[in-house]
Amino acid sequence: MQQNKLSLSVQYADTRVQDILTRPLLRKWVKAALLAPAQITLRFVDAAEGQILNRNYRGKDYATNVLTFTYNDDDGSDIADDAVTQADIILCTDVLQREAAEQNKTLIFHAAHLVIHGVLHAQGYDHESDEEAEEMEALEIEFLAALGFPNPYIEA
C-alpha cells in the first residue's frame, strides 16, 4: 500500500488520554486510513466542549464521540480529488471512555476505530444511506484489521 504524506497536529484540550493515546499511536492510525496526502488536526476535548461544538455545528445539544470538519475551497465547493485532504477531527474523551466501557472494548480499540472513522469522513466518506454506511464500515474493518484490531461491529 502506498504511504501518503501526512501533516498531523494533536491537541489535548482534555489531557486525561495523552499518556494512552500518544502521538505516535495516533499517527499510525491516521496513516492506516489515508487514501491521499493530508493535513489533519486531532483534538481531544471534554464533554462540555464536545457538546458546544456539536450544538453549534450540527444543531445537536449533546456531546458526541467524533466530529470531523473538512475544509473547502473559497467558493464552497469540495477540494479537488487530487488535493491534500485538510480536516480537524474532534474526539470527546468522555464519550469515548463511556462507549468503550458500554461496548466492552478497550479505550485503545475504540479510539482507533473512531480516529479511522473521522479520517474517512475527512476524505469524503459518509454513512447517510445504507450503501454508504456499508462501504464506510467495510473500509473501517479493513484498516482496523491491518492494525491488528478485530471487527468493531461484532459485539463482544
Curated annotation (Swiss-Prot):
Cofactor: Zn(2+)
Alphabetically ordered keywords of this record: Cytoplasm, Endonuclease, Hydrolase, Metal-binding, Nuclease, Ribosome biogenesis, rRNA processing, Zinc
GO cellular component, one term: cytoplasm
GO molecular function: metalloendopeptidase activity; RNA endonuclease activity; zinc ion binding
Biological processes, Gene Ontology terms: rRNA processing
Residues that hold Zn(2+) according to the record: 117, 121, 127
UniProt protein name: Endoribonuclease YbeY
PANTHER family for this protein: ENDORIBONUCLEASE YBEY, CHLOROPLASTIC
Pfam families (UniProt xref): YbeY
